[in-house]
Amino acid sequence: VTEIIYALGAESQLVAVDTTSNFPSAAADLPSVGYVRALSTEGMLSTDPTLILGEDDMGPPEVLSQLQSLGIELSVIPEVWSGKGILTKVECVSSIVGADRRASDALIGSLQEHLDELSARRSQIDKPIRAALLLALRDGVPTAAGSATSGNGVLEMAGLTNVFADFE
């Protein structure tokens, strides 16, 4: 979501980001509210937000409920791990932040070109390619992308078979 906001030219609206927002590098200059799935009410309130925008994996739910009960608007975008899902996410974020329509159309057009190119390359794969997507977290212990992850969606969009698809 952070990357989309920057790509739309709406970064001046950001007051903080979560620790997974590491692109573009300018996002690192903003205060961090912690890990997207382990947010705290106090940490969020310390940034004085008027809107909290994120995907449906942010939480925990109790924190989001507390923030809403304090009158902070919450916009949750469903994460769909596909090319169409990415384009829909851009449209949602653009609408929520009131981005310039030309910026939104340009970003969607550029992404669609990349998705079309990816589709063409994927059609050239003649036998299944097994792959793993590993993330190196701060403690140095790698985490594998299972079936219910955005990493799995990336592998599928690339035409690859996730070797860890049996795990969520």
Residue ranges of model-derived segments:
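Short secondary-structure boundary/capping segments
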Residues: 6-7, 24, 66, 122-123, ...
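Short, glycine/charged-enriched secondary-structure capping and boundary segments
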Residues: 8-12, 29-31, 66-69, 90-91, ...
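Short coil/turn segments
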Residues: 10-11, 19-20, 36, 55-59, ...
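His/Asp/Glu-enriched short active-site or ligand-binding loop at hydrolase and phosphoryl-transfer sites
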Residues: 18, 145-168
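Extracytoplasmic substrate-binding proteins
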Residues: 51, 62-140, 164-166
